[in-house]
Amino acid sequence: VSTEVVRGRAYGHGPRRLVRRTNERHQWEKNRARAGREERGATGATEHDTGLTVDDLVFHAEYHDVRADEELARALRVRVGTRLVERLYRTRYREEAAPLNMTRSYLVHAMVASNPDLLDAAREPWPGGTQSQLCTVGVEVDRVEERVTARPPTAEEARELALPPGTAVMVLRKACVDTDGRVVDWSEVILPGDRTEAVFTTRLERW
């Protein structure tokens, strides 16, 4: 199952768009997860990271019914063979041919099946993103754990992201953990090294 949403003018040519990812985006998302649909739909995480508007973006999503292999079972803390919802996302700036990143995300089917809309790619892009989706089935995200590594791209990644020769990719693996300690979403994001900036802000307690 897949869906693609194109907003704004037709594709043209323009400069590569910088994506600035900050760890503060997660609290920003949570603050909006229970807001009204109009507020949630006005802007999303991609717009937050790029400074673009909703109308600047071309969005594509695919959903698949899959079973957990050893890697996914370990990441989601479930048994091998557990039924999952695999979600593949590509979002690009309408002036560029390559997506901003390559994302694959996994939800445990049993956790979200009570809301059929969460199994339907045609409902994407979901206003408010994953935290808002999870909120509809009574799940509150307590913390987000992220691990970032760098490596050379595969041939497929280099082609799809239109990477210049010698450019590395950043691989971000993210686990969303709920208030009961369950991993409720695990995702892997492949970020192009030539146009991604990671910003980490740590709030310190005052003396």
Identify the meaning behind each predicted range.
Residues 74, 87-92:
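Internal active-site segments that recognize and position negatively charged phosphoryl groups
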